[in-house]
């Protein structure tokens, strides 16, 4: 049985850990509220943008703009992998990395070259351990970012696609469904799919007839690159919110585990102290009996 001092030290250590996990839970909760507000503000714009651009693209031939062109032979696949920069968020990062690596393995098995575009340290570190090229590795970005981050990634993948260095682009990110549910999603980014095939957020059914001026071709040249960046930004926002929700849940579970451990150690402490008292009493009684004899 451990000594009383050892048990006291363990209890003090667990209490300090509990303070840390509780503080991290509160920080994650505050950051999650901010991330949710950003998503709620952005989603209506994104939904209308998807609806309008999908209608616009359906009126044009795929040969009008190279971003609409579906290539007959896919030689190189670009995977944009969005993860967090830090851990302590349960299985959040491992789920995203597993999804991306499975996708990369599938593409490689089909004879395609794979390039990773990583945002977040966890995804970057995992991608560097593979045999695939890491064309972009951005770290310390997910804590605080704006549309410029999506713009930077978008310009890279668009230029690579137009230069035929990439033939398709897929984004792997964490979709924020609820506080308790975050899903790893593999979303095709390029080539841009027609409206009926689009893997975009569902928008309310609309019977609006759009009138486009000037010509459709000119509008597509301006709007298609922005559409790519909007998709990337939405994925980054979802990943950020999912990270904070996952960390909040992980820290809540850790705090509960600390409470359970403190309870068990306190019980052990009481048992150890009681055993010590019993031994002392037995020694006293034994000594008294010896004196009588």
UniProtKB/Swiss-Prot annotation:
GO terms for cellular component: plasma membrane; proton-transporting ATP synthase complex. InterPro entries: ATP_synth_F1_ATPase_gsu, ATP_synth_F1_gsu. Keywords: ATP synthesis, Cell inner membrane, Cell membrane, CF(1), Hydrogen ion transport, Ion transport, Membrane, Transport. GO terms for molecular function: ATP binding; proton-transporting ATP synthase activity, rotational mechanism. It is found in: Cell inner membrane. GO terms for biological process: proton motive force-driven plasma membrane ATP synthesis. It is a peripheral membrane protein. Transmembrane segments: none annotated. Produces ATP from ADP in the presence of a proton gradient across the membrane. The gamma chain is believed to be important in regulating ATPase activity and the flow of protons through the CF(0) complex. F-type ATPases have 2 components, CF(1) - the catalytic core - and CF(0) - the membrane proton channel. CF(1) has five subunits: alpha(3), beta(3), gamma(1), delta(1), epsilon(1). CF(0) has three main subunits: a, b and c. NCBIfam families: ATPsyn_F1gamma, PRK13424.1. PANTHER family: ATP SYNTHASE GAMMA CHAIN (PTHR11693), ATP SYNTHASE SUBUNIT GAMMA, MITOCHONDRIAL (PTHR11693:SF22). Belongs to the ATPase gamma chain family. This is ATP synthase gamma chain. It comes from Nitratidesulfovibrio vulgaris (strain DSM 19637 / Miyazaki F) (Desulfovibrio vulgaris). The gene is atpG.
């Amino acid at each position: 049985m451990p000594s009383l001092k050892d048990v006291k030290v363990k209890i003090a250590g667990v209490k300090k850990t509990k303070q840390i996990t509780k503080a991290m839970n509160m920080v994650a909760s505050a950051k999650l509220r901010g991330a949710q507000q950003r998503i709620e503000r952005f989603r209506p714009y994104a939904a209308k943008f998807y609806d309008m651009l999908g209608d616009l693209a359906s009126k044009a031939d795929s040969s009008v703009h190279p971003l609409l062109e579906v290539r007959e032979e896919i030689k190189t696949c670009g995977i944009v992998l969005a993860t967090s920069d830090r851990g302590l968020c349960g299985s959040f990062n491992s789920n995203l990395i597993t999804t991306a690596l499975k996708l990369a393995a599938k593409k490689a098995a089909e004879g395609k070259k794979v390039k990773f575009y990583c945002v977040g340290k966890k995804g970057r570190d995992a991608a560097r351990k593979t045999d695939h090229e890491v064309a972009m590795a951005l770290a310390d970005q997910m804590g605080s970012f704006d549309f410029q981050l999506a713009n930077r990634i978008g310009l890279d993948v668009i230029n690579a696609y137009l230069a035929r260095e990439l033939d398709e682009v897929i984004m792997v990110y964490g979709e924020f469904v609820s506080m308790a549910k975050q899903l790893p999603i593999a979303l095709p980014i390029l080539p841009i799919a027609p409206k009926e095939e689009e893997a975009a957020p569902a928008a309310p059914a609309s019977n609006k007839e759009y009138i486009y001026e000037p010509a459709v071709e000119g509008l597509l040249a301006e709007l298609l690159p922005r559409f790519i960046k909007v998709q990337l930004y939405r994925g980054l926002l979802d990943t950020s919110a999912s990270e904070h929700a996952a960390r909040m849940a992980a820290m809540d579970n850790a705090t509960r585990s600390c409470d359970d451990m403190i309870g068990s150690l306190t019980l052990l402490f009481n048992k150890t102290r009681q055993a010590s008292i019993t031994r002392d009493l037995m020694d006293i009684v034994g000594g008294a009996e010896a004196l009588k004899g």
